[in-house]
A protein has these predicted regions:
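N-terminal membrane topogenic signal
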Residues: 2-13
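Soluble extracytoplasmic regions of secretory-pathway and membrane proteins
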Residues: 13-16, 22-881, 885-909, 913-925
Length: 925
């Protein structure tokens, strides 16, 4: 007996070990998740959605398991029949244990599958359903609050489809069980007949819910003149669904009565009625649409088109747009420009795409440092608002030498990036490079507002794995010449590496080194989920996060700001987003309701509600109390850096191309469809991206930080309007549309691009530069509204066709009305346009040169030719050597010499005209 007892204990131990081996990693992952959520202060959030998933999964598992088990148990209660030699039929005695196992095993697997699927699909919908917030907007057909469609309809649909699917699976299990036990015999079909009727009754009762859901979903119909329910949908299809629902009730009754009375005729009455309604309804739909609606579509569909216009504008927040007339034909003077110095001083002369290349070439310092992207923002510097580009210097562990990518280096030593680079958008050096206001390692600056005192970046866009800090291995901080500075983490983030936690993380990360490394001690802490996007998505998986976070310098600290969105595809009558490249493809309601901040040093993560009108985010706030803070609770230093979401603005401007038309007749006939204005970038025609400008809105003296995007008529290039999103203080989020008078013609960006290409002097220079291994980049064309007029500004970059090239700003093109000039600086261009020596406090000079052709107005024809040849040879040599600063200087000299040649007379004392002409005709770069 003692042996048996010991054997039992051994078996129990083996069973425990087996469970740990199989489920240990999952248990460890759950435990480490809980530890992490507790560490960052969001344990209630984790427990809430974990419990919700478990509760939903358990409830569905129980329902599906019991339904499947008992129906299968019924299928096994009939004993199989066997014929003996005299054709006598006998029943094989049933084995109760065996039949229960036959019913139990498939039911158990189906229940587990149903519970898992339902927990994933339903937990969020159920929580929102229980805590739903009214939208205070009703649909124009049924008069239901929009919240019904956000919360109720989504839940009902999911439950309906899951119920139908699992009912069908249970039905198939019953068929298979019967045929397995009885074989394909007459008796098996007889036994299944009654059961089929019961399942049919269940299905037709489910179909009642399906028809009612179909009726509600008519508000998203896409087969009419517009998105949403149209004339045929509401006059024919909706009544058909209601009649079909009644027919389903009748069908269930006739099936049940027919079964009891064993009357096939009675049982068939309901199905025949249901099929008849659906057939007649389908014919009626086609008849009404083709013979009543289509011949007079605009008159029949007009009220529904109005519904579509109104609800689409509400769904995307476009109903809040303020429209302002903007003539755009005002006359600007130099005095006007000097009154608008805040605008002039913030005109963006450097483009973000070449700028990121320059940052990585000049400021990465080491191969393992990388600038991921460049973001634009504004800072108050010396009492004035200044636009800047800012980019974080992150550490990319994958760029370490392969031999250096050891476990110690990746997880204990190379733990963080360092600092950031800041450059004003309107200043360039004499080499055409961005002027650095914050640069180097450690970061240095002469601008007090941009001082960085905590430059370490433990949480960023490239921090994709955990690190363990405060170990016996000092952390690499930053390079200092031939040596490296070292540091120890002093922040609050991290989970203490106790022995138990070490074991959990070793199991979770499948790495024994975490448990056994002697470099990890009781003071060590593990930092998890350091990628800021992964971090916020793990905390709030129900939000959609912008993939372009931006960095803010906050009193010396570095803080990431991330836009978070709520969205739905259930806004009645609202057109859906058709751009497949959009993160909201297929949705028809989007709000940038939340701003998230993540401290780059300690990972502190906070969620702020910035749109209180959004019922979705208000419901999430009820579901997860303590997760969201109000906008008033956001620190002022962060709040003044909030920007209107470019992603949302792109969605809104794309929708507004058509939905600015409020008249249903104009909308139906597409009489006034707009397009996003086009521009040339490099050599490619593309839609203009939204861009930020500093300007005073008409009627206001205050300069604001605005996000704008111009519109043109579809298939035309003149500009008809521009939409602005305000960003500052109490005006944050307000949209203003500036419309040009229909009777006036304002140059659109594509027309200005064409004028630049057709200008003989400009095109000649661009063609000369765009040869022999060099490339001209025509940067973003900026449309700058100033007072009641428009300036168009396009920086010109020059670069080489190799990976180490540094793009340089070599010219600025400015267009105003019918005038267009190209100069080395914005000041020079404005001076040429407005006839005065205009000097802004803005951009620095691009490459300037001094050469004889500039100063000597009395050179002879032969001297001018010689200057051209000399400048050409020097420019060609500089291009071959990749010396683009000198190249720009000699190209300036070449331009001046060519201009000087035009002023001289070929009848001067030249005896080499033919030779000179031959040589000049062979000049190409």
């Amino acid at each position: 007996m003692k042996f048996l007892a010991n054997l039992g204990k051994a078996g129990l131990l083996i069973a425990i070990i087996a469970v740990l081996v199989v489920f240990g990693p999952q248990i460890a992952h759950f435990a480490t998740d809980y530890l992490w959520f507790s560490e960052i202060g969001y344990a209630p959030v984790f427990l809430k959605f974990t419990f919700a998933k478990f509760a939903v999964g358990a409830a569905v598992f129980l329902m599906v398991f019991l339904l499947s088990y008992f129906t299968l148990l019924v299928s096994t209660k009939y004993q199989p029949e066997v014929k003996v030699e005299d054709d006598t039929v006998i029943n094989v005695p049933e084995k109760k244990t065996g039949k229960r196992v036959l019913a139990l095993i498939p039911s158990l697997f189906l229940g587990l599958f149903a519970g898992w699927i339902s927990a994933t699909a339903l937990w969020q919908n159920i929580l929102l359903f229980l805590e739903q917030t009214p939208a205070n907007v009703v649909d124009p057909v049924f008069g239901r609050d929009i919240s019904f469609y956000f919360f109720n309809l989504s839940l009902f649909e999911t439950v309906y489809y899951l119920a139908f699917f699992f009912m069908a699976v249970i039905f198939m299990f019953n068929l298979l069980m019967t045929f397995y036990l009885q074989g394909f015999s007459k008796r098996s079909f007889k036994l299944m007949g009654k059961r089929i009727i019961y399942f049919a009754i269940a299905f037709v009762l489910l179909m009642i819910a399906g028809f009612q859901l179909n009726g509600a979903n008519l508000l998203y119909a896409q087969d009419g003149a517009v998105f949403g329910a149209g004339y045929t949908d509401l006059k024919v299809t909706l009544p058909m669904y209601n009649l079909a629902s009644i027919a389903c009730v009748i069908t269930a009754i006739t099936l049940l009565v027919g079964l009891k009375k064993k009357s096939a005729r009675i049982a068939s009455l309901g199905p025949v009625l249901l099929i008849g309604i659906l057939v007649i309804g389908g014919v009626a739909q086609g008849t009404v649409q083709n013979f009543i609606v289509n011949p007079a579509e605009i008159h029949k569909e007009q009220p529904y088109i109005s519904n579509n216009i109104e609800m689409t504008n509400k769904a995307y927040g476009l109903d809040q747009i303020t429209e302002v007339q903007f003539s755009g034909d005002g006359v600007l003077t130099a005095s006007d420009l000097k009154d608008e110095m805040d605008t002039i001083n913030n005109i963006r002369l450097i483009d973000y795409r070449p700028t990121i290349t320059v940052f990585n070439q000049l400021q990465s310092m080491r191969l393992y440092y990388k600038f991921v992207d460049v973001d634009i923002d504004r800072y108050n510097i010396d009492g004035a608002q200044q636009q800047v580009y800012l980019s974080a210097r992150e550490l990319d562990q994958n760029s370490l030498d392969v031999s250096a990518q050891t476990w110690v280096n990746k997880y204990l030593k190379y733990t963080h990036g360092y600092g950031a680079v800041v450059t004003p958008v309107n200043k360039v050096t004499t080499q055409g490079q961005p002027e650095m206001w914050v640069e180097n390692i450690p970061p240095t600056t002469s601008v007090e507002e941009l001082m960085i005192t905590r430059p370490e970046i433990y949480f960023g866009q490239l921090t994709n794995d955990y690190v363990i800090v405060n170990t016996k291995e000092p952390e690499f901080d930053y390079p200092t010449g031939d040596t490296n500075a070292q540091t120890q983490y002093a922040g609050d983030a991290g989970i203490n590496m106790t022995m138990g936690n070490k074991a959990l993380f070793a199991l979770d990360r499948a790495n024994y080194k975490i448990l056994f490394s002697n470099l990890i001690n009781s003071d060590s802490k593990i930092l998890l989920n350091r990628n800021i996007l992964d971090r916020v998505e793990k905390i709030a998986p129900f939000l959609t996060f912008d993939q372009d976070p931006y960095l803010v310098i906050d009193n010396g600290n570095l803080v990431w700001v991330i836009d978070a969105y709520t969205s739905s595809n259930k806004y009645p009558y609202a057109a859906r987003i058709s751009n497949t490249a959009s993160p909201f493809y297929g949705q028809n309601y989007v709000r940038n309701s939340v701003k998230v901040t993540v401290n780059a040093y300690d990972g502190e993560t906070k969620f702020y509600i910035v749109d209180n009108s959004d019922p979705l985010v208000q419901s999430y706030a009820k579901v997860f109390p303590g997760l969201f803070l109000t906008l008033d609770e956001m620190p002022h230093n962060i709040r003044e850096h909030l920007k209107y979401s470019t992603t949302l603005f792109e969605v809104q401007t794309e929708i507004y191309q058509r939905y600015h038309m409020k008249d249903p007749t104009v909308f139906y006939n597409k009489e006034d469809v707009w397009s996003i204005a086009n521009e040339i970038y490099g050599n490619q025609i593309e839609q203009m991206e939204p861009y930020f400008v500093n300007m005073s809105l008409p009627g206001s003296d205050a300069t604001e930080f605005l996000l704008i995007r111009p519109f043109t008529p579809t298939e035309k290039n003149n500009m008809v309007a521009w939409l602005a999103a305000r960003n500052d203080d109490e005006n944050y989020g307000k949209l203003v549309l500036f419309k040009f008078p229909k009777q006036s013609t304002i140059y659109g960006p594509a027309q200005v691009e064409a004028r630049i290409s057709n200008d003989s002097e400009i095109s000649q220079n661009l063609n000369l530069w765009d040869q022999q291994g060099s490339s001209v980049i025509r940067s973003n064309l900026l449309v700058i509204p100033i007072q009641n007029s428009i300036l168009y500004i396009e920086p010109i970059y020059l670069t080489t066709n190799n990976e180490n090239s540094l793009p340089e700003v070599v010219r600025i093109v400015v267009a105003y009305k019918d005038q267009i000039v190209m100069a080395k600086t914005l000041d020079e261009a404005l001076s040429q346009l407005f006839g005065t020596n205009f000097e802004s406090a803005g951009p620095g000079d691009t490459p300037s040169t001094s050469n004889p052709a500039e100063n000597d107005s009395t050179v002879t024809y032969d001297e001018a030719v010689q200057q051209i040849k000399t400048a050409y040879q020097n420019a060609k040599l500089s291009a071959q050597q990749g010396n683009w600063a000198d190249y720009g200087k000699y190209m300036d000299a070449l331009e001046k010499a060519i201009n000087q040649l035009g002023k001289t007379s070929s009848t001067s004392e030249s005896t080499n005209d033919a030779e000179n002409i031959d040589e000049l005709s062979n000049i190409t770069l």
